[in-house]
Regions:
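Cleavable N-terminal export/targeting peptides
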Residues: 1-33, 240
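Short glycine/proline- and aromatic-enriched beta-strand/turn motifs that initiate or cap beta-hairpins
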Residues: 29-79
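Repeated loop/turn-to-beta-strand initiation elements of outer-membrane beta-barrel proteins
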Residues: 32-34, 66-72, 98-105, 134-140, ...
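Transmembrane beta-strands of outer-membrane beta-barrel pores
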Residues: 38-44, 74-80, 109-113, 132-134, ...
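Residue-level signature of outer-membrane beta-barrel architecture
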Residues: 40, 62-64, 93-95, 101, ...
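Residues that define the transmembrane beta-barrel architecture of outer-membrane proteins
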Residues: 52-56, 83-87, 101, 120-124, ...
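Detector for outer-membrane/organellar transmembrane beta-barrel domains
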Residues: 119-184
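Outer-membrane beta-barrel "beta-signal"
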Residues: 163, 198-208, 213, 226-240
């Protein structure tokens, strides 16, 4: 019998892990859960961080105690399904401020393990976010690049909004401003750039379809040797 290629086995393992997390979530009062998504590219704060092609993303979370969450995700692209282009890990603590507002503190790590050049952009981050129901979120983050020779802590501000329209369709909006250090993403000097997105989202029964227009300021940095602008982003996702 012909053996299944290793890269395909790895992709199947990631997807099965996500599906298993979702099944456990149903059995254990949603203490576990997950999602699988297909996106047209991989965008982080307005910057394309991987080749501009279809990306498979899998994510899972665990709620070990009231208010606490642990989550992880992986992004894969063809043809190297056995080599993730991005991985993330997050621990969070949330508090209800009242019946409308919630605050969450998070520690995050973003890894880009494709090669030595992309690993330079591995990022560690701490953030505080305030959310009004599921409609509006403000966040303040500080981050640096631990693998870079010199990497001071930088600050980013983000606001996102979800405006319900009709028939499970909503307007998705976002805007942010982030500082980048000198020599990051090919920049000759440090600076601050702005980014945002506007789009439509359809959500029903665990399925999500989304199309967004990505907007960035003229001085937006680019990953060295990486892709250029990606003005449109499409997503199909299924949560479990």
């Amino acid at each position: 019998m012909r053996r299944q290629p290793r890269r395909h086995r790895t992709l199947v393992q990631w997807l099965l892990l996500t599906l298993a997390a979702g099944a456990c979530g149903s059995a254990l009062a949603k203490d576990f859960g997950g999602a699988v998504a297909l996106t047209s590219s991989l965008i982080d704060r307005g910057i394309s961080i991987a080749p501009n092609k279809v990306t498979v993303q899998a994510a899972g979370y665990w709620l070990p105690a009231p208010g606490w969450s642990l989550s992880t995700s992986v992004a894969l692209q063809s043809p190297a399904w056995s080599d993730p282009v991005a991985v993330t890990a997050q621990v969070g603590r949330a508090w209800m401020l009242d019946d409308r507002w919630q605050m969450q503190a998070s520690l995050l790590y973003y890894g880009y393990p494709t090669d030595r050049a992309t690993r330079t952009f591995d990022r560690q981050e701490a953030s505080l976010a305030w959310s009004y129901r599921d409609l509006l979120t403000f966040s303040l983050s500080t981050f640096n690049f631990p693998r870079a020779d010199r990497s001071p802590w930088n600050v980013a501000f983000d606001v996102t909004a979800n405006v319900p329209l009709r028939n499970d369709v909503s307007l998705s909006l976002g805007a942010g401003s982030s500082r980048f250090p000198a020599m990051a993403y090919g920049a000759a000097r440090s600076g601050r750039y702005q980014y945002g997105q506007v789009g439509l989202k359809w959500n029903r029964g665990g399925w999500t379809l989304k199309a967004e227009r990505i907007l960035t300021s003229g001085n937006t940095p680019r990953m060295q040797g990486g892709p250029g602008d990606m003005p449109w982003l499409g997503t199909v996702a299924r949560t479990f």
